[in-house]
Amino acid sequence: MAPKSAAQALFEKADKKANSSGGWFSSANSKWEEAGDLYQQAANAFKLEKQFKEAGDAFAREAECREKCKESLDAGNAWWNAAKAYKRGYPDLAIQALQQTIQHLVAGGRFRQAADREKEIAQIYLQETHDLSRACESFLRAGDWYAEEDATATANQCYKDAADLYAELEQFPQAITLYERVADHSLTSNLTKYSVKEYWLKSLLCTVALGDIVTARRNAQKYIGQDNTFVGTREFKFADALMEAVDAGDVGAYTAAVVEFDRITKLDNWKTAILLKIKRGIQEEPGLT
């Protein structure tokens, strides 16, 4: 039988302390404090041994001990340490630990830090579990918390990320609402005004993907009313050419507009995907040969 590692020995010592009845002269709090300290030591030892699941479990036990002592700040930090360990291959457990962290942060009024952790959850959903719908929800929550803390630029990035994902999920009305929201905020600053044309282009592409050319044209005019320089941009001219081609059911004109735009501004994966969807919609129109 292999000898116990130092980390395992510490973990068992912590378990023994947590399960003890305590002595005549010791308080319940001191028992949980000592057990929490031992779990923390065990967790760090597991990390040195690169046993990240075990490290996360030990940090989670530490967090529970801190909670029993009503030490919310320390409990939140322990849950976050658990999440960082779980992120090394255990995304579902990492999400659960981050959610616990957020509860403590919100209870303490630390919404900026709560937003940071919620954004981490969104990225795990996106990159590890590939659950785009839940990633959208987490990006939105993070964005709302950032907005409440006047971190407008970071909030807008979260809303934009959510909009991109909603479009991938073909939930275009939600995407349009968010792109317009980010554009409205961006118009208020000279530092971010330049990016507005990109948000409006994406919004128009989503509207065209819905097959609603009338609303797309109405929205384009609304955007020009908000910033009359938009009409002279490549983004507007591209969207306008696409609307004309889709309205006419002209696949050739549509393809030519896409090729011309891509020649100067390389299409990213998001635009390529939605443009292919729109093209398929033209080809599937009844009576089109």
Swiss-Prot record:
Membrane topology label: Peripheral membrane protein
GO BP term, pick one: SNARE complex disassembly
Record bears the keyword Lipoprotein: no
InterPro entries in the record: NSF_attach, TPR-like_helical_dom_sf
Subcellular location: Membrane
A Pfam family reported for this protein in Swiss-Prot or TrEMBL: SNAP
CDD domains, per database record: SNAP
Record-level GO cellular component terms: SNARE complex; vacuolar membrane
Key words of the record: ER-Golgi transport, Membrane, Protein transport, Transport
Transport is among the record's keywords: yes
Superkingdom in the source lineage: Eukaryota
Record GO terms (molecular function): soluble NSF attachment protein activity; syntaxin binding
Described purpose of this protein according to its UniProt entry: Required for vesicular transport between the endoplasmic reticulum and the Golgi apparatus.
Family in the record: Belongs to the SNAP family.
Protein name: Vesicular-fusion protein SEC17
Gene name, Swiss-Prot/TrEMBL: SEC17
